[in-house]
Amino acid sequence: HYHLKTPLLDWSHSFFVALYFAFEDLEPEQEKYRVIYQLNDFLPPEQDVIITPKIKIGARINSQNGVFTKLTSYHLEELASYNRPEYLGKGVPFISKYLISSKLRMDVLNFLASINIDPYTIYPDLLGKMKACEIGIDNAIAEINLEYQD
């Protein structure tokens, strides 16, 4: 969205890309957990919520393996109500929520970088270069803070 507000919510077919987005920002470290939602592709036909662009609209959506939904928090809760045995079929819930400790931020980002998931690959443009610099600065500050704690 290039930081424009839209009614669309970004999703990725890649767990690792979702993990990157969950840990990208430094600020939520005050929060105990980062959250990743998993939306099942095999929703009931009346729940046509996943929007896949017919044409690739830019390098970002390609590199992020992205799709969109037009869901409010109310709609997410409604989908969660389908997580009942009579709807589950093969036992796969329609929406799942994963909580991961915010304390793992640097470990997660370092792991993702080791498998080539970083700002350069997520944002293959100038923003990616800027975000890579920000993460480098965050890392340097975190290391300095650790030295002062010892």
Walk through the language-model features, giving the residues of each.
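Catalytic-core elements of nucleic-acid end-processing and repair enzymes
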Residues: 1-150
